[in-house]
Amino acid sequence: MDLVKYLTFSMILFLLGIWGIFLNRKNILIMLMSIELMLLAVNLNFLVFSVYLDDMMGQLFALFVLTVAAAESAIGLAILVITFRIRGTIAVEFINCMKG
């Protein structure tokens, strides 16, 4: 297993996620997808180091991060659908007008 290739790929995925957030700050759906891409890059790091060091903790952390990411996606998409139904748009500049 070539560790440098996997870590480089993971770094590229993480940087693409950061770039997606900074490039498109108007659409919250793309921001959520970019955050998911960043979490997948972190998971890849956990899995690569888990295999490289022959330790199961990295795989357990990756499973935990996937669980949290799934919950975060479900809540984020639910808020997104409700916001679209109420406001008619998913632009980020109107999100701060939420009542709570």
From Swiss-Prot:
In terms of InterPro entries, this protein maps to: NADH_UbQ_OxRdtase_chain4L/K (IPR001133), NUOK/Mnh_C1-like (IPR039428)
Q: Where in the cell is it found?
A: Mitochondrion membrane
Reactions it catalyzes: a ubiquinone + NADH + 5 H(+)(in) = a ubiquinol + NAD(+) + 4 H(+)(out)
TM spans (from-to): 3-23, 28-48, 62-82
Alphabetical UniProt keywords: Electron transport, Membrane, Mitochondrion, NAD, Respiratory chain, Translocase, Transmembrane, Transmembrane helix, Transport, Ubiquinone
| Keyword Membrane on entry | yes
Q: What is its main location?
A: mitochondrion
Record note on quaternary structure: Complex I is composed of about 45 different subunits.
NCBIfam families the UniProt entry points to: PRK05715.1-2 (NF004320), PRK05715.1-3 (NF004321), PRK05715.1-5 (NF004323)
Listed name of the protein: NADH-ubiquinone oxidoreductase chain 4L
Native organism is Marchantia polymorpha (Common liverwort)
